[in-house]
C-alpha cells in the first residue's frame, strides 16, 4: 500500500511538472520549477512547514554553491574555501538543488534523482563537472545544517480564541484550527528579528477606516456579489492559491526572457525567496500579535462592534466559500506580492515587464500584466474581492513586504 501511495504521489508530481520551456531553463530555473511542483503535490511536505522555508533553503544553497565558484557577489552564509575557479557552476547548482530536495523531500527521491540526472547530462563530462558537483553538495550540506533547529519543526501551539469583538475566531464553515502559530518564532533568514518591521495595530472598530473597509468587503466579497464586476469575481478566485508559487513562476518567466546566466539566476531566486520566507515569518509575527478577526466573523458579528455604520449579515460567506485559517491582519497576499514585485523590479532595474500568469486554481486561465507592480496590486485587491481580507490588512501587508524586500536587497548578496 505504501508503494502504491508513493507511486500515485509521484504521478501527481509528474502532472504538475509537465511545463515545457521553450529553451533549456538551466539548473536554477529547473529546480525552482520542480520545487513548486512538489509543493503543489498533496502531502509532499508537512502542513506545519511553510513552503517558503523550503524555497529559501533551496535557493540559498544554489546561490552560495554557484558563488563559491563565480565569486561575483557576497556569500549568503557559505563561501567554500578552495572551490576551483574553473568548476562548473551548472554542476554546482544541479548538485546543490539535488542535495537540498533530497533532504527536504526524501520520499520523492526517484523524482529528484531523475531531474538531477537530466541536468547532469546537459553538462560536459570532465574535471569541472566533478568539481562543481563536489562544491554544490558541500555547500548545500552546510546550508541545511545552518537551518537545522530553526524553530520550524516544533509542534504548533493551539490557538485558543477569546470571544471579544475584533479578536480572531475560527471561521465558518469548517472552523479549522489556526495554522502556523509557531511561525513567529522561526529564525529569520535575513532579518534581525521577526518583529523588525512589525506594522502598527489595525484600526479601531469604530474608526472610519474600519467602517469603509468593512463595508467594501461586505459588498464585494460574497459569492457572485451583484456589486462586483465579472472581472472582480474572476480576480478574487484567480489568485486564491499559494501566492509564493505565483511569484516564483513570474521570476521563472523573467529569468528566461532576460536570458540570465546561471550566476544571475541563482542570485535572483535567492533574493526573491529569502525575502518571501522572511516576509512570511514577519507577517505571522504580526498576525499572532494582533489576532484580528477575519471579515467573515466581523460581518456576521457586526452587531457587537459598537459601530453604528456596520450592519451584520449572519449568513455571510466569502466568494471562496472558506477562509484562510489564520488572523486577518496583515494580509499575506499583499505582503508576499509586494515583496516579490519589489525584488524583481530591483533586480532588473525596472518595474516594466510584460508577462502572462496562469492561475493555480483555474486550470489554463491566464491573466496578462505589463509590470511587476501591476500583478502585485491585482493580488492585493483579489483578497477583498474574495471576501478574505479588509483593505487595511492588505495595505499593512504590502508595507511589510516592501520593508522586508528592501532590507534584503540592500543588505544581502551584493
Q: Which residue ranges define each predicted feature?
A:
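Positively charged n-region of N-terminal signal peptides that target proteins for export
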Residues: 1-5
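Sec-dependent N-terminal signal peptides
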Residues: 6-14
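Sec/Tat signal peptide C-region and signal peptidase I cleavage site
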Residues: 18-22
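Acidic/polar surface patches and capping/hinge elements
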Residues: 23-414
Amino acid at each position: 500500500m505504501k508503494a502504491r501511495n508513493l507511486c500515485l504521489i509521484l504521478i501527481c508530481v509528474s502532472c504538475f511538472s509537465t511545463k515545457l520551456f521553450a529553451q533549456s531553463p538551466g539548473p536554477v530555473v529547473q529546480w525552482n520549477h520542480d520545487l513548486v511542483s512538489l509543493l503543489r503535490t498533496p502531502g509532499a511536505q508537512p502542513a506545519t512547514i511553510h513552503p517558503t522555508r523550503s524555497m529559501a533553503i533551496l535557493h540559498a544553497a544554489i546561490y552560495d554553491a554557484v558563488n563559491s565558484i563565480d565569486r561575483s557577489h557576497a556569500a549568503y552564509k557559505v563561501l567554500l574555501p578552495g572551490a576551483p575557479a574553473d568548476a562548473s557552476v551548472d554542476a554546482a547548482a544541479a548538485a546543490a538543488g539535488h542535495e537540498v530536495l533530497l533532504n527536504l523531500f526524501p520520499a520523492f527521491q526517484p523524482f529528484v534523482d531523475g531531474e538531477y540526472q537530466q541536468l547532469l547530462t546537459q553538462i560536459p563530462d570532465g574535471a569541472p563537472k566533478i568539481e562543481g558537483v563536489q562544491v554544490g553538495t558541500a555547500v548545500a550540506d552546510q546550508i541545511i545544517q545552518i537551518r537545522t533547529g530553526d524553530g520550524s519543526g516544533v509542534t504548533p501551539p493551539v490557538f485558543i480564541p477569546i470571544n471579544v469583538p475584533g479578536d480572531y475566531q475560527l471561521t465558518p464553515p469548517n472552523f479549522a484550527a489556526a495554522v502556523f502559530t509557531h511561525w513567529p518564532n522561526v529564525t529569520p533568514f535575513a532579518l534581525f528579528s521577526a518583529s523588525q518591521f512589525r506594522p502598527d495595530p489595525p484600526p479601531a472598530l469604530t474608526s472610519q477606516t474600519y467602517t469603509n473597509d468593512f463595508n467594501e468587503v461586505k459588498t464585494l466579497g460574497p459569492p457572485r456579489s451583484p456589486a462586483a464586476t465579472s472581472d472582480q469575481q474572476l480576480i478574487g478566485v484567480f489568485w486564491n492559491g499559494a501566492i509564493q508559487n505565483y511569484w516564483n513562476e513570474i521570476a521563472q518567466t523573467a529569468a528566461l526572457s532576460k536570458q540570465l546566466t546561471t550566476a544571475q539566476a541563482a542570485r535572483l531566486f535567492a533574493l526573491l525567496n529569502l525575502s518571501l520566507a522572511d516576509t512570511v515569518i514577519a507577517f505571522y509575527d504580526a498576525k499572532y500579535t494582533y489576532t484580528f478577526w477575519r471579515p467573515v466573523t466581523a460581518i456576521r458579528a457586526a452587531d457587537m462592534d459598537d459601530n453604528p455604520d456596520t450592519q451584520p449579515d449572519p449568513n455571510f460567506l466569502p466568494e471562496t466559500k472558506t477562509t484562510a485559517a489564520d488572523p486577518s491582519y496583515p494580509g499575506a497576499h499583499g505582503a508576499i506580492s509586494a515583496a516579490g514585485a519589489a525584488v524583481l523590479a530591483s533586480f532588473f532595474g525596472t518595474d516594466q515587464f510584460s508577462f502572462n500568469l496562469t492561475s493555480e486554481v483555474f486550470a489554463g486561465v491566464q491573466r496578462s500584466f505589463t509590470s511587476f507592480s501591476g500583478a502585485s496590486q491585482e493580488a492585493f485587491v483579489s483578497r477583498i474581492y474574495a471576501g478574505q481580507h479588509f483593505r487595511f490588512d492588505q495595505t499593512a501587508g504590502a508595507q511589510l513586504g516592501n520593508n522586508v524586500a528592501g532590507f534584503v536587497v540592500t543588505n544581502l548578496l551584493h
